[in-house]
Amino acid sequence: MNDTEGHVDILVCMAGTGGTGFGTASYLRSRNPNLQVVLVQPHPDSRLTPEHPDAQIIDGVLPAYDVPESTLSDYLWPDWSDACINVRTEEAYETAHEVLRAEGLFLGTSAAAALHAAVQVGRRPENQGKNIVVIVLDNGMKYLSTPMYRQK
């Protein structure tokens, strides 16, 4: 809150169990009732399904939109968010590599996916000048042996 002088217009967060996003959104909405919450979930191509049994997934992330209610956690209900962005695993990998090279930040897949979505949100003309906060929850350490950080 210090970095934004107490004002956040848009919160971008991943759909994991939903607890962090829900709690953060609840607090920020108490400060700004007009807060927009953008939930980020894996693109259908980046989910393990019978149609995609070998999909590279965004680790620790669950879809919240367009899925059976029985699969949602107690906090992962799409009604607390205003929009949803699907991110492909490859987009998360590309973002992680770009940020590592440019900024020296070593992101994991879910952090990179959230950042990828936040950049998309920030590029929209209607969001120019708005304070956008993104929650990044993982680093790249546990992904060193995965395709994400293997040498190309």
Residues of each region from the PLM?
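Short glycine/serine/threonine-rich phosphate/pyrophosphate-binding segments
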Residues: 14-25, 110-118, 143
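Active-site/ligand-binding loops adjacent to catalytic centers
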Residues: 30-109, 147-152
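Phosphate-binding loop/pocket of nucleotide- and phosphate-handling active sites
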Residues: 59, 70, 74, 116-152
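Short beta-strand segments
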Residues: 13-15, 39-41, 133-138
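Generic structural signal for well-ordered alpha-helical scaffold segments
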Residues: 1-5, 25, 97, 118-123
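Glycine-rich ThDP/TPP pyrophosphate-binding loop and its adjacent helix/strand module
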Residues: 1-36
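Short glycine/serine/threonine-biased micro-segments
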Residues: 14-17, 21, 58, 102, ...
